[in-house]
From Swiss-Prot:
InterPro entries with a match to the protein in the record: OM_porin_bac, Porin_dom_sf
Job of this protein: Involved in the uptake of chitosugars.
GO terms assigned for molecular function: channel activity; porin activity
GO terms for biological process, alphabetical: diacetylchitobiose metabolic process; monoatomic ion transport; oligosaccharide transport; polysaccharide transport
Organism: Escherichia coli (strain K12)
NCBIfam families per record: ChporEntbacChiP (NF047822)
Pfam families: OprD (PF03573)
Protein name, as recorded: Chitoporin
Similarity comment: Belongs to the outer membrane porin (Opr) (TC 1.B.25) family.
Record-linked Gene3D superfamilies: Porin
Length: 468
């Protein structure tokens, strides 16, 4: 998209006006110019169309509409430079416009806005258009130290993370960290974040945090994390997080990269752990002991045109919930947490006892005189998925000794415009066929995060632009 450059006198005047109205002393021009001259205003226009059908095993195995909608998004993201090389401001907003939606489509579709403005008020009744302020943060830096506060997205090493549609979710809180470079000995980075409210990108209003009963208040979430890069292709990461008085979470990751046949092979081991502090068999009692998800990942780029991925996960999640969650509050869209595993094959493959293997490949067609085009495919097979080890009110399908299998495959086609005013605009088509190898209805039988067979088609357009 077109880039505009030059003096930003209008922006400077607006900032000066805001400063004056706020009652702050005007800063000398020489010390304020970094705030203006180093600022950026970027954005994007986004289109999403989805058709997803799901099998209903209670109605003759018919496939029924689960999602069917088309939605536009657009955003503007202002990031200032730093006045006095220390103080700055970031502000961003986006809009969602619902173009069409099938009456049988499920809600929320997570691209438009839910008709329920808050996470804990969600009633699954519909979607709507609207505008959301998703970033409004004061920022600070001094030497190796940085900090941000306000409406923010986590950027450091903690376990807190936002949901994503085209845009990210938003926390109300503060985050601070530091980066230290020790030359050949390595580099250390660490950060801490505290938050008391959150909104997913499909909710318009912030909500507080609660335990699983949606009434017992959790005053805050917080997390501390660190990363050490040894500068020899070996990286260690660790983090700890808490939902006040309720959930503890743990994370560790080791990554190593080395060459095979002249191309890089990236490997990692990842551990995610969580446990609750409730042990009374109430609705807030999620896990028996520590639940965890472990992962091994391998990524290889061959001949500079083929990206190959081989990844595996293993889950332990004994207890009433029956599956592992990376977020510290269990209610849908109430917060989110770090998980560096993303397969885009519909299921989370995170049931108690479940093991899963993923293989994916993406082929860049530039050597076929098709610059910007890429095609890909992936497959997941998972087994030993167990239901919750106990439930207060089990349904007729519940059998704690049962295990089921899941599998899915996906196909991708991508085109990215290589030059001109629309350079960087991407078109992507994604198809998934998901198979639940059982006749248990969606979410039934103690499998609270497994649904029935699906066919899913997504078409996306992402058109970024820069104003200055």
């Amino acid at each position: 998209m077109r880039t505009f450059s030059g003096k930003r006198s209008t922006l400077a005047l607006a900032i000066a006006g805001v400063t004056a109205m706020s009652g702050f002393m005007a800063m000398p021009e020489a010390r304020a110019e970094g705030f203006i001259d180093d600022s950026t205003l970027t954005g994007g226009i986004y289109y999403w169309q989805r058709e997803r059908d799901r099998k209903d095993v209670t109605d003759g195995d018919k496939y029924k509409t689960n999602l069917s909608h088309s939605t536009w998004n657009a955003n503007l993201d202002f990031q200032s430079g730093y006045a006095a090389d220390m103080f700055g401001l970031d502000i961003a907003a986006f809009t969602a416009i619902e173009m069409a939606e099938n009456g049988d489509s499920s809600h929320p579709n997570e691209i438009a806005f839910s008709k329920s403005n808050k996470a804990y008020d969600e009633d699954w009744s519909g979607d709507k258009s609207g505008i959301s302020l998703y970033k409004a943060a004061a920022k600070f830096k001094y030497g190796p130290v940085w900090a941000r506060a306000g409406y923010i997205q986590p950027t450091g090493q903690t376990l807190l993370a936002p949901h994503w549609s085209f845009m990210p979710g938003t926390y109300q809180g503060a985050e601070a960290g530091a980066n230290f470079d020790y030359g050949d000995a390595g580099a250390l980075s660490f950060s801490y974040m505290w938050t008391n409210e959150y909104k997913a990108p499909w909710h318009l209003e912030m909500d507080e945090f609660y335990q699983n009963d949606k009434t017992t208040k959790v005053d805050y979430l917080h997390s501390f994390g660190a990363k050490y890069d040894f500068k020899n292709n070996f990286v260690l990461e660790a983090a700890f997080g808490q939902a006040e008085g309720y959930i503890d979470q743990y994370f560790a990751k080791a990554s190593y990269k080395f060459d095979i046949a002249g191309s890089p092979l990236t490997t990692s081991y990842q551990f995610y752990g969580t446990r609750d502090k409730v042990d009374d068999r109430s609705v807030n009692d999620l896990y028996d002991g520590t639940a965890w998800l472990q992962a091994l990942t391998f990524g290889y780029r061959a001949a500079d045109v083929v990206d190959l991925r081989l990844e595996g996960t293993w889950v332990k999640a004994d207890g009433q919930q029956g599956y592992f969650l990376q977020r510290m509050t269990p209610t849908y869209a109430s917060s989110n947490g770090r998980l560096d595993i993303w397969w885009d094959n519909r299921s989370d493959f995170n049931a108690n006892g479940e093991k899963a293997v993923f293989f994916g490949a993406m082929y860049d067609l530039k050597n076929w005189n098709l610059p910007g085009f890429a095609i890909g495919a992936s497959y997941v097979y998972a087994w030993d998925a167990k239901p919750a080890t106990w439930q207060s009110n089990p349904d007729a399908y519940y059998d704690k000794n049962r295990t089921i299998e899941e599998s899915a495959y996906s196909l991708d086609a991508v085109y990215t415009i290589q030059d001109g005013r629309a350079k960087g605009t991407m078109f992507k088509l994604h198809f998934t066929e998901y198979d639940n190898h059982s006749d248990i209805p969606s979410w039934g039988g103690g499998y609270g995060n497994i649904f029935q067979d699906e066919r899913d088609v997504k078409f996306m357009v992402i058109a970024p632009f820069t104003i200055f």
